[in-house]
Amino acid sequence: MEQEQDTPWTQSTEHINIQKKGNGQQTQRLEHLNSTQLTDHYLKIMSQADMHRQTVYWKQWLSLKNLTQGSLKTHVLKRWKLFSRQEWIN
C-alpha cells in the first residue's frame, strides 16, 4: 500500500500533536484542522506574507538615493491614506 506523500498544503494544514509517554518517549499524532482552525491558519500565514511584502517594499523605497524629507512625507501620507481606506473596506 502506498503512503500518501506530504505536500506543502497538507504539511501546513495538519497539526502535529506531540505527547510524552511515562517512559519519556514522544509520540506524534497528526490532527486535521477544523474549518475555524484552518481559517485562522490561513489568515496568520497571509498576514505574515503581507507584512514581509510591505517590509521589503519599504526597504527598497528607503534605499533610493534621491530621498528628500518632502518626498518621504508625501509618500508616507499617500501610503497611510491607502492603508486606512483598505482597513475601512475590510
Curated annotation (Swiss-Prot):
One Gene Ontology term, aspect cellular component: host cell cytosol
Keywords: Apoptosis, Host cytoplasm, Host membrane, Host mitochondrion, Host mitochondrion inner membrane, Host nucleus, Host-virus interaction, Inhibition of host innate immune response by virus, Inhibition of host MAVS by virus, Inhibition of host RLR pathway by virus, Membrane, Modulation of host cell apoptosis by virus, Viral immunoevasion
Annotated region described as Disordered, given as residue ranges: 1-28
Domain of life according to the entry: Viruses
Principal location: host cell
UniProt record, GO biological process: symbiont-mediated perturbation of host apoptosis; symbiont-mediated suppression of host cytoplasmic pattern recognition receptor signaling pathway via inhibition of MAVS activity
Region (Mitochondrial targeting sequence): 65-87
Pfam families xrefs: PB1-F2
Location of this chain's protein in the cell: Host mitochondrion inner membrane; Host nucleus; Host cytoplasm, Host cytosol
Annotated site, Low pathogenicity, chain positions: N66
Oligomeric form and interacting partners: Oligomer. Interacts with human SLC25A6/ANT3 and VDAC1. Interacts with host MAVS.
HAMAP family: INFV_PB1F2
Job of this protein: Plays an important role in promoting lung pathology in both primary viral infection and secondary bacterial infection. Promotes alteration of mitochondrial morphology, dissipation of mitochondrial membrane potential, and cell death. Alternatively, inhibits the production of interferon in the infected cell at the level of host mitochondrial antiviral signaling MAVS. Its level of expression differs greatly depending on which cell type is infected, in a manner that is independent of the levels of expression of other viral proteins. Monocytic cells are more affected than epithelial cells.
Family that this chain belongs to: Belongs to the influenza viruses PB1-F2 family.
Anything else known: Is not encoded in all strains, and seems to be dispensable for replication.
Name of protein: Protein PB1-F2
Organism in which the protein naturally occurs: Influenza A virus (strain A/Chicken/Victoria/1/1985 H7N7)
Organismal lineage: Viruses, Riboviria, Orthornavirae, Negarnaviricota, Polyploviricotina
Gene it is expressed from: PB1
